[in-house]
Curated annotation (Swiss-Prot):
Protein's name in the database: Cobyrinate a,c-diamide synthase
Enzyme class (EC, first level): ligase
Active site: 330
One GO term (biological process): cobalamin biosynthetic process
Segments forming domain GATase cobBQ-type: 247-439
Keywords tagged on the record: ATP-binding, Cobalamin biosynthesis, Glutamine amidotransferase, Ligase, Magnesium, Nucleotide-binding
Enzyme Commission number: 6.3.5.11
The organism of origin for this protein: Synechococcus sp. (strain ATCC 27144 / PCC 6301 / SAUG 1402/1)
Residue stretches in coiled coil: none
Catalyzed reaction equations: cob(II)yrinate + 2 L-glutamine + 2 ATP + 2 H2O = cob(II)yrinate a,c diamide + 2 L-glutamate + 2 ADP + 2 phosphate + 2 H(+)
GO molecular function, one term: cobyrinic acid a,c-diamide synthase activity
Bilayer-crossing regions: none
Length: 456
């Protein structure tokens, strides 16, 4: 068994509840496997910080329902407990007409009971109407319990319990208003763990709260994996004939840290040797690499440091010029441009492999896209289709003459042309999950294997 943590809406305390439960279980010396519904990168960083295990994303759009089931079973089998953090409100999905890609959708795919987090601030009896609606909106779902968050006084809690009693939904946790457990955020959500030097003290506090604020006699059996069936699954790793392992340089530091753990696993399983390097601190690329992987992150926050590291910028430019295949997404795309202009309108030189400038702004570009390749790249042939996810506040100052992708929204409406390609370059705002299209790995590694290894 496992639990999925859902909220009545965004901002009610799903992440706080999840981290509190994870910290409390970890304090008991238990192994805990966590998952995150949807394409988010930052919440899984916090999960990993607490549990010491990679959090796995469950996304039926970037992958598919079979992959979601495979991923969940595969990684839950090696842990004592399993916990899934939902996304937005329980039923919030791609459209208002369906709950596709919502927390409810994942709960049905995996047949998981739901722990519903309610924001009880400034409400009393009305909380029962909210809980009743969620309890009865979809009869296929099981609300196993409630977490009452942001509870004020003891009198407030008594009113809430009296109101909820007729619904017969167990109250499995009560979290009081706590200013000292707030985690700071900025323009794309929570600030990543690598930038929070005092995070461990917050997690320690959450572990204590977790022991005190939850009904563990009823909660622990719901989280335990003792009855999880061991299942054999068909491998999702593509069959690739490689002469030897292919060394790939992975940009990974405070500026670049948006990666799916599954992508790394799938690359390694297919024959890649992943070598981490830092565009912030390292002066050269690792010797002998045959490919570059520049993930997303916050290059705009560290633009001055990235710009100051001239040797690293030159090394990346040289590698691409020499024909080393490069896969860059979102923050990696921004790094490859000529300049980044930050929120204060300060301009910083970047790699310059793409003749364009990244301009930060207030407008958030967000959502799933169906992307059809208009040009070939190291990952795709012209005409191939993938699903990806956009999440950024930067934009392009110059038009793209021959975009890599033509994008469509989930409803099929035309969006726009996006991305850059060369025979050895794939650079796009789209975040891709290789579990959805394993042939992306095959194309990339075969292109890398054909490249001459980088020499200094």
């Amino acid at each position: 068994m496992a639990l999925i943590i859902a909220g009545e809406r965004s901002g009610v305390g799903k992440t706080t509840t999840t981290l509190t439960l994870l910290a409390a279980l970890k304090a008991r010396q238990a192994s805990v496997q966590s998952f995150k519904v949807g394409p988010d990168y930052i919440d899984p960083m916090f999960h990993r910080f607490v549990t010491g295990r990679d959090c796995r994303n469950l996304d039926p759009i970037l992958t598919d329902e079979d992959y979601v089931q495979h991923c969940f079973q595969q990684h839950s089998q090696t842990a004592d407990y399993t916990l899934v953090e939902g996304v937005m409100g329980l039923f919030d999905g791609l459209t208002g007409k369906t709950d596709t890609a919502s927390t409810a959708h994942i709960a049905r795919i995996l047949n998981l009971p739901i722990l519903l987090v309610l924001n009880c601030s400034s409400t009393a009896r009305s909380i029962a109407a909210i809980a009743y609606g969620y309890q009865n909106f979809d009869s296929r779902l099981k609300i196993a319990g409630l977490v009452l968050n942001r509870v004020g006084s003891d009198r407030h809690l008594e009113l809430l319990k009296d109101a909820l009693e007729p619904l017969e939904i167990p109250i499995l946790g009560v979290l009081r208003r706590q200013d000292e457990i707030q985690i700071p955020d900025r323009h794309l959500g929570l600030i990543p763990t690598s930038e929070l030097p005092h995070l461990q003290s917050v997690i320690d506090r959450l572990a204590v709260l977790g022991q005190q604020c939850f009904d563990w006699n009823r909660l622990e059996p719901l989280l335990s994996n003792s009855d999880l069936n061991s299942t054999a699954f068909k491998s999702t790793t593509p069959s690739i004939s490689l002469k030897s392992s292919v060394p790939i340089a992975i940009a990974r530091d405070r500026a670049f840290n948006f990666y799916y753990a599954d992508n790394f696993d799938l690359l390694r399983a297919a024959g890649a040797e992943l070598i981490e390097w830092s565009p912030l601190q390292d002066r050269q690329l690792p010797a002998g690499v045959q490919g570059l992987y520049l993930g997303g992150g916050f290059p705009e926050v560290f633009a001055a440091e990235l710009s100051d590291n001239l040797l690293a910028r030159q090394a990346v430019q040289t590698a691409i010029t020499q024909g080393i295949p490069c896969y860059a997404e979102c923050g990696g795309l921004m790094y490859l441009r000529q300049h980044i202009i930050d929120f204060e309108q300060t301009q910083y030189p970047m790699v310059g492999a793409i003749a364009a400038t990244a301009q930060m702004g207030s407008r958030l570009t967000l959502g799933y896209r169906e992307a059809t390749a208009q040009q070939a790249s190291p990952l795709l042939q012209k005409g191939q289709v993938v699903w990806g996810h956009e999440f950024h506040r930067s934009s392009l100052r110059e038009p793209i003459a021959q975009p890599l992708f033509q994008l469509q929204n989930f409803d099929g409406s035309l969006h726009y042309g996006e991305g850059y390609s060369q025979p050895n370059l794939h650079a796009s705002y789209l975040h891709l999950h290789f579990g959805g299209k394993p042939w992306l790995i095959q194309n990339f590694l075969q292109a890398c294997q054909q490249a001459t290894a980088l020499s200094r």
